[in-house]
Amino acid sequence: MQNYSRTDFAQVGTTNRGCMRVIPSDKEKEHDLIVVGGQNGSLICLSRKSNDTTIIFKTQPGYPVQSLALGGPASSKKKDKIFVASQNTVRGVNRKGKTFFSMETNMAEVANRMFVRGLDVVLTGRKSYSRYHDTVDSNSYLCTEDIHDVVSLVFEEAWGSREYTSILACGNSTLQIIEGNNFAYDVRLDSVPFTVSLFMGDGGHTKLLVLYGTKTGRLGLVSVPQGGGKILWEIDTTSGACVTTIVCFNVTGGQFPDIIVGKEDGLIEIYVIDETDHAHLFGTFSCDESITGISCGHVSSKSEIDIIICTFTGWLFSLAKTSRPMIENLPVAANFSVKMQQLRSEVEELQTKVNEERLRYEEITKRQGSGTGSTFFHSFQVHENFEYSAAHGAYNLTIELVIPIDFVVVQSQLPIRLMEVEKNASVVSEVRQDALNPWPLLASYRCQANVCRLELRVQANEGDSGVINLYVCPKVMPKCAQITTHYIKALSSHMRSHDFDLYRPMNTLQFTGNFSIAEAHAWLHNLLPNVPSKCPPADTITNNYQCSVNGGTQLQVVYSKGSAVFRSDCMTTICIIRDKVSEQTMKMQIRVEVACELNQDSVNHCLKLIDPKITSMLNIEKNKLYAAALKELESNNDDVFSFLSAANAKILKDHDAIYEKSEGVSIEDSGVLAILENLMVARGKLTGRSSKGRGDAIRDLISTDYSLENMQTLFKNAMND
């Protein structure tokens, strides 16, 4: 967005998602206010005038503010009452900072998300949904999946004959529609929805349209009438980062309200709406910090609209058109110089005090170095996100601090590969595993100056599981580090799916014995991602999954008391499940019977699924070699195009594009060889045959004479030997 510029307002401390709003002014000539709730529990209201930020009020610290919403009479468009959710309590504060409402709910969980309209307050915890009408508990629902966000339809005429209707964004890749106390239906998505918002602020022309943003960076629109909903459209945004906030407001001057999207990687995107309710990208802006809130209003000027953004680290800033004068009321030059001199003097005085206190602290620490005294360590919060990316076939790990990061040490129990990230402003060094270093991976990321956000990407082979420890050390004295732990599961590349193709060649693995459904659910929780820690209340549970790295093989799990059945068209998946579940049953001393039915046709089926990926990568590498050779030929010949064929001439013309496309593409680093080798080993384990030496044969075939038929022949010969 070239016509927009950033203006910083203030830094208010770390914030949670959805804890900032713009309060509309109650007088025409006054500017709108900004209210933000911090993780320290304090509520701050700010105003902006003459390029100066003023605090209107600030409440006392307390429990972290989990969610913030604006409310008012249902019949009025003006929403200037502030509602704050902390723990299981909701408070109402007016624009002057006076508390006019307080309600302690009966929720057993922390209220993470909130929606307010009129006398209705909707709260959601991790798995619970509650609606309070005039402080009375009117509706409740217990969800079996994690709830990421909630929104309610705001016009009664849109409900029809149904009760109060809310939409939940759930962790099983669905939007669940709740009518009163009951689950009405769900809308199935391809990825996990993380944010929901009413289309155009009120549900659009039908009042039944809801926008959603997913963890994979997709934006969609769904219609939720009574009886069943449908997806109207879904598009990719400019990056695959998680969508953290969606706001509808007319900032471009078009006919309809625009869609403003904030993301985990700091991108702000604006989409304009056409007459068919479809979205088109207008522009983007990057701030390199996690976005936790976006709101709009006349904060700095009554003539133009400000887009107010809040980040995790607490920065409040606006995006406004550059046509606005940067300084509205320019002060007298003499007064301005005096004020600047005063500020310089204050900064120098503070710097002197900081240096004196730092020296005094170091002396105290040295004197108490024997351990008889106590040393103060700085407390800091690590904001991190550890999510599997199907597009990259790897885990994306984001670390963000309020203070600059000095270095991060990665310590892994399993052999993982570190992948390059474009935005990673750090120097990486790895320590090889040896007698002094028992860890399969030990690496450090030393950051450049003033880096508060670090992005990493790690890749693990399917079947490997274990713990990754991160030691995060900020640039403070004395040196201290905070340890965070993440667990990579054996079937980490399997994503939840809504469909299962029964016509594929299937391998079946069944466990029977004296175990409960909760124990079977625990096995699944340790194997697969996005499985709730608690077992859903059902006699029989069925889950479908699809693998994102080997061409799209499927897995279906059906478990109940005393029985767990796994069906997959990939022998590697069946072998991993058999090994991992057997380990857990032995630890728990549960006696089970194992039955395994193999379909040899599934091997050729898996090779067909992975073939397009291998062929594409080999063609890219081949074109890269051709382009390099032709470029060298061109450097030694002025009229090279006179004797080149049309195909070779095109390769030479596309030299730069081919090299750009081939960047990061490698058969060795892609994990394709590991997929084929694991398939060979898994079939050998399940059939009782040796697969020794077959890995080298697979590598030789891919590097010399790969084709689907040759690979199928290699696997067939290995079976017959």
UniProtKB/Swiss-Prot annotation:
Gene null: resulting phenotype: Mutants have normal body morphology, but with reduced body length and width, delayed larval development and decreased roaming movements. May exhibit defective chemotaxis tendencies. Defective cilia structure and function. This is characterized by increased accumulation and mislocalization of intraflagellar transport proteins and impaired movement of intraflagellar transport proteins along the ciliary axoneme. Defective polycystin-mediated cilia signaling and mislocalized and increased accumulation of mechanosensory receptors pkd-2, osm-9 and odr-10 within cilia.
Keyword Cytoplasm carried by entry: yes
Keywords for this protein: Cell projection, Cilium, Cilium biogenesis/degradation, Cytoplasm, Cytoskeleton, Protein transport, Transport
GO cellular component: axoneme; BBSome; ciliary basal body; cilium; membrane; neuron projection; non-motile cilium
Subcellular location: Cell projection, Cilium; Cytoplasm, Cytoskeleton, Cilium basal body; Cytoplasm, Cytoskeleton, Cilium axoneme
A GO biological-process term: protein localization
InterPro entries reported in the protein's UniProt record: Bardet-Biedl_syndrome_7_prot, BBS7_GAE_dom, BBS7_hairpin, BBS7_pf_dom, Beta-prop_BBS7, Quinoprotein_ADH-like_sf
Protein's UniProt keywords contain Ribosomal protein: no
Tissue: Expressed in ciliated cells including amphid and both inner and outer labial neurons of the head and in both phasmid neurons PHA and PHB in the tail at larval stages L1 and L2.
Superkingdom of the source species: Eukaryota
Pfam families recorded: BBS7_GAE, BBS7_hp, BBS7_pf, Beta-prop_BBS7
Function (record text): Component of the BBSome complex. The BBSome complex is thought to function as a coat complex required for sorting of specific membrane proteins to the primary cilia. The BBSome complex is required for ciliogenesis but is dispensable for centriolar satellite function. Required for proper BBSome complex assembly and its ciliary localization. Required for cilia biogenesis and both the assembly and movement of intraflagellar transport proteins along the ciliary axoneme. Plays a role in the removal of degraded mechanosensory receptors within the cilia.
Subunit annotation: Part of BBSome complex, that contains at least bbs-1, bbs-2, bbs-4, bbs-5, osm-12, bbs-8/ttc-8 and bbs-9. Interacts with bbs-1.
Protein name: BBSome complex member bbs-7
Organism: Caenorhabditis elegans
